[in-house]
Every structure is written in structure tokens, then in C-alpha cells.
A protein has these predicted regions:
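Acceptor/aglycone-binding surface of glycosyltransferases and processive sugar-polymer synthases
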Residues: 22-24, 29-45, 50-53, 62-144, ...
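Catalytic donor-sugar/metal-binding loop of nucleotide-sugar-dependent glycosyltransferases
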Residues: 115-116, 142, 151-169
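Conserved hydrophobic residues forming the short capping helix/wall of the S-adenosyl-L-methionine
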Residues: 9-17, 72
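Active-site phosphate/pyrophosphate- and oxyanion-stabilizing loops and adjacent acidic/basic residues
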Residues: 7-10, 40, 152
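A conserved acidic beta->alpha catalytic loop
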Residues: 1-7, 58
Length: 197
């Protein structure tokens, strides 16, 4: 990995094992093909009924879903839940520039692809396994735009997405290049515009 993700994963597992009794299995890819590729591999290997995806910097607590369950926000009619930093009940701590960049990207995604989801880029997402397997098997993008492709794939299958509040804290360990990555993502968004789903 060219970024610090492997070291972050190793550190997280060590800390997690110290404080919890949950078993963790690390799946290592031979090559760094991007976040989308890593998630696709993880979903393929997952065994339980629900699959949670999240960013390794833990901007959102791994156990945020417990708060959702406590508030009875998980319903049978929904199979996919997206953490949303724009939700009115979310608590978000991030720098001003990242906030502005996020707003611009959200506007572009909505304008170009007619997507109504307000926060496609929050990495904290919960899927029913059968849905995750179906959608991730069709995923082609491995970069930051993979989140947008997931929404389009879900939309094509008429699978509803429910956006839920999160407590989100910006971590400086993020591998996002604030100059180059948004450009690549915009190109990816326009390419998705002309793809059939």
C-alpha cells in the first residue's frame, strides 16, 4: 500500500483485540488496487447476515450501528444504510476546507447523475449480505468514485437506501489528496453518466 492503511489496520487490530473478544480476520490483497477493490474482496469473504464497511481511520466509531439499533432506526423494509454527515442529527467535526470540498462534490454528483443521496462519500455503510454481494460483484470503479457507483447500482435494482446520523471526527491520517483526488473523482462521475446500469 502506498498510503498508511496497512499500518493503521495493524494498529487498530492490536487495540481492538486488547479491548474486545470479537474475532478478526485480515485479508491481504496482493496489490493495492484502491478502496473499492479492497471492499469488494472483503464483502466476498464476509460470512454473516449483515456487512459493515467503514474507513480505517475510524472517523466514525465502529460501533455507530449500535446507536442506530438503540434508536430503532434499523427497519425490515431497508437493506442498506448509509452514514450521513449531512443528516440533521449528525455531529460532525471537520476542517472548513474539507467541508467546502464535500459540498462541491455533493452538488456535482447530484447535478450530473441526479442522485438524491446527500452524502455518498461517508465510508460508514451497513448492508444486508445478499444485497452487498449482489452490488459489489458488479462494482467496476476502485477509486473514491466507487461510492457513487454503488448508489447507481442500488438505484438500478430499486433497492432503497436510508441515510442515518453519525458522529464524525476528521482524522489527519486520511490519504485523500485534496488537489488531485477530487479531479479524478469528477472525471469518474462524468464517465458514470454515460454508463448503462
Amino acid at each position: 500500500s502506498k498510503d498508511n492503511s496497512y499500518n493503521l489496520i495493524t494498529q487498530f487490530i492490536q487495540n481492538f483485540k486488547t479491548n474486545n473478544r470479537i474475532k478478526i480476520k485480515v485479508i491481504k490483497s496482493k496489490r493495492n488496487l484502491g478502496k473499492g477493490s479492497a471492499l469488494k474482496l472483503g464483502v466476498k469473504k464476509a460470512k454473516h447476515d449483515w456487512i459493515l464497511t467503514t474507513d480505517i481511520d475510524m472517523s466514525v466509531s465502529l460501533f455507530q450501528f449500535l446507536n442506530w439499533m438503540k434508536k430503532k432506526l434499523i427497519h425490515k423494509k431497508y437493506f442498506v444504510y448509509f452514514g450521513s454527515r449531512t443528516h440533521k442529527e449528525s455531529i460532525v467535526k471537520k476542517n472548513i476546507f474539507r467541508n467546502m470540498l464535500g459540498n462541491v462534490m455533493t452538488f456535482c454528483i447530484s447535478a450530473v447523475l441526479n442522485i438524491k443521496i446527500k452524502d455518498t462519500q461517508c465510508g460508514y455503510k451497513l448492508y444486508k449480505k445478499k444485497v452487498a454481494r449482489l452490488i459489489f460483484s458488479k462494482l467496476k470503479n476502485c477509486g473514491f468514485e466507487h461510492d457513487v457507483e454503488l448508489v447507481l447500482l442500488l438505484k438500478s435494482k430499486q433497492i432503497k437506501i436510508r441515510e442515518l446520523p453519525v458522529k464524525w471526527v476528521h482524522k489527519s491520517s486520511s490519504s485523500l489528496n485534496i488537489l488531485w483526488d477530487p479531479v479524478k473523482m469528477l472525471v469518474g462521475i462524468f464517465l458514470l453518466k454515460f454508463r448503462k446500469f
